Structures are given as structure tokens and as C-alpha cells.
Curated annotation (Swiss-Prot):
List of residues binding substrate: 163, 192, 249
Site (Important for substrate specificity): 192
Catalytic activity: L-homoserine + acetyl-CoA = O-acetyl-L-homoserine + CoA
Entries under HAMAP family matching the protein: MetA_acyltransf (MF_00295)
One GO BP annotation of this record: L-methionine biosynthetic process from homoserine via O-succinyl-L-homoserine and cystathionine
Protein name as it appears in the record: Homoserine O-acetyltransferase
Role, per record: Transfers an acetyl group from acetyl-CoA to L-homoserine, forming acetyl-L-homoserine.
Gene that encodes it: metAA
């Protein structure tokens, strides 16, 4: 089944060109089945880019999914037009009475700030708590994962001396995990962050299970079984050119930035980067969608009961 998104969402044209099945609202009504209700709290500056990346992965599922785009109300994005926000996004206050099968919270380029200094931290902690009663399975990404792990588990983040930036090898630590079904033993995932969580801190917390790890960049994916939550500290959702654009942006701004590790053939920025993580990105999101579908109540009203 395809993903259901607004007919005029900019991501729609991109997804159709890539062969992703996209459903009109008329077609969705005609099928007369309950789609999975998935919401995306998009904290990234380039919201159109991020919503396209997430919709691409969710839309590959054989299940019908309806995607709701959400933003925090206490922050006005500078890189996305008000017209786009008004047309396609709702604030959390506007959807807080609803229930969702899945809820994705993205990263944000504020990882070097203490959590409590983020101008929408209070609202975000309310959203975290709300997911425990109104969401069946939350999925946190990068800074969103660090923030949620700190909020729920007291897991600290640490400043890195240099940015972890590139495509790094990772290990599958749990072949039996349904979230890692089909994963190789060893695979590549993009990383782009100035902070880290540490393996020793994760292992001290019995409520967390380490599923994916890297010798180079540390813990990547955690599971909280009791809360049916996933914490992804890296950027498996990135498309082929995300790291390239970040590198060129920082270089043009005169910032100290190294060539992303393991990304360009021969570490030559003049060459076309190779996407070596696409299949595992689809596997992870597909497995999450499937697990959510298998365990969520048929009636949304029963979520949280």
C-alpha cells in the first residue's frame, strides 16, 4: 500500500519520480481500511528535505500509511516559508488530542547546547510525556534521540573534539531483533554530529538494549522495549547528497570541517558520493512499520490504555 500525503506537498512530485507509491485522499477513502497513523515532528531546518526523506522510507512499506506533519509551537523556523508551514503542518497543541500508531521526532542542529537551554525544551518534554499515552511506538532520530534518552533515562551526551562526520561501519548486535530483520552483520550508516552517547552509560541502564554499535562512533540504535521506542543516533534516513550539502555549506561558510569519512570515492569531493546505506534504511523503517502494525490496537482509542 502507498503512503497518504497531501496532494500538493512538495515531496509528492519527488517521490513519484522515484517510483514511491503515493496515494491521493480519494483513493485512500475508496480502499476503506484503517491506515497506520504516523506523525513526524520535524525539528530540522530544511523541513521539505526531511519530510521527503522520511516519506520516501515510510512510503516503501506494503501497508497504507497516513503521514501527519507536526512542528513545535514555541519556535518559528527560519528556513521554511510560513506558507509551507501553514499549508502542511500542525502544531503539537493542534494534534495533542489525537492518537498515533507511530511518532517520529527528528534531529535538530542544536546538539552542542545543553538540553535545558533549547528554547522549546519545555514543550518538547511535554511531547515526550504525551507519547507515552497517545503513541503506540515512538521513533527518535539523532538529536531527538539524545534528547528523549536524556529525558526518559537520564542518558548524558558528551561533546566530541571533532565532528563525527561521514559514513561509518556499524555492527548488528542482535540478529534476533525484529527491527533488524534482514540486516547484514556489518553495514554503513551516515553520521553527522558533534556529540555522542557512550556505550558504558547505555549498558548501565537495563531498560535500554543496544542493537547497533560502531567502533568508530559508538552506539547507534537503542531499543526501549517497555515503551516500544527506538533511539537512532545517526542519520540512516539521509539521501545520497545530504552529507555533500552539509560539507559544502560549512566549507563555504569558512567553518572548520573535514571531508566526510568514507563518503566520496578516494575521499575526493570532486567525485560522486556512493550511497551504501539505502537498503538498510528501508529495512529499518520497514521493520518498524511492520512491528507497529503487528502490535498496535485496531482502534486508535485503545492506544495508551
Amino acid at each position: 500500500m502507498p503512503i497518504r500525503i497531501p496532494d500538493t506537498l512538495p515531496a509528492r512530485e519527488t517521490l513519484l519520480k522515484e517510483g514511491v507509491a503515493v496515494m491521493t485522499e480519494t483513493d485512500a477513502v475508496r480502499q476503506d481500511i484503517r491506515p497506520l497513523q504516523i506523525a513526524l515532528l520535524n525539528l530540522m531546518p530544511n523541513k521539505i528535505r526531511t519530510e521527503t526523506q522520511i516519506a520516501r522510507l515510510i512510503g516503501a512499506s506494503p501497508l497504507q500509511v497516513e503521514l501527519t506533519l507536526v512542528r513545535v509551537g514555541g519556535h518559528t523556523p527560519k528556513n521554511t516559508s510560513q506558507e509551507h508551514l501553514i499549508s502542511f503542518y500542525q502544531t503539537w497543541e493542534e494534534i495533542r488530542e489525537r492518537k498515533f500508531d507511530g511518532f517520529i521526532i527528528t534531529g535538530a542542529p542544536i546538539e552542542q547546547m545543553p538540553f535545558e537551554e533549547v528554547n522549546y525544551w519545555e514543550e518538547l518534554t511535554q511531547i515526550f510525556d504525551w507519547t507515552q499515552t497517545n503513541v503506540h511506538s515512538p521513533f527518535y532520530i539523532c538529536w531527538g534521540a539524545m534528547a528523549a534518552a536524556y529525558h526518559f533515562h537520564g542518558l548524558p551526551k558528551y561533546q566530541l573534539e571533532a565532528k563525527a562526520f561521514g559514513v561509518f561501519r556499524h555492527r548488528n548486535l542482535d540478529l534476533a531483533s525484529p527491527y533488524l530483520s534482514g540486516f547484514s552483520d556489518d553495514f554503513a550508516i551516515p553520521v553527522s554530529r558533534w556529540t555522542e552517547v557512550r556505550r558504558a552509560d547505555v549498558l548501565e541502564r537495563q531498560s535500554l538494549r543496544l542493537l547497533i554499535d560502531s567502533d568508530d562512533t559508538g552506539p547507534c540504535l537503542l531499543e526501549d522495549r517497555a515503551r516500544r521506542s527506538l533511539y537512532m543516533f545517526n542519520h540512516v534516513e539521509y539521501d545520497s547528497f545530504s552529507l555533500k550539502e552539509e560539507f559544502e555549506r560549512d566549507r563555504e561558510a569558512g567553518k572548520q570541517i573535514q571531508v566526510p569519512f568514507g563518503y566520496y570515492p578516494g575521499d575526493d569531493p570532486a567525485r560522486q558520493p556512493l550511497n551504501r546505506w539505502r537498503s538498510h534504511a528501508h529495512l529499518l523503517f520497514g521493520n518498524w512499520i511492520n512491528q507497529t502494525y503487528q502490535s498496535t490496537p485496531f482502534s486508535l482509542d485503545e492506544i495508551g490504555q
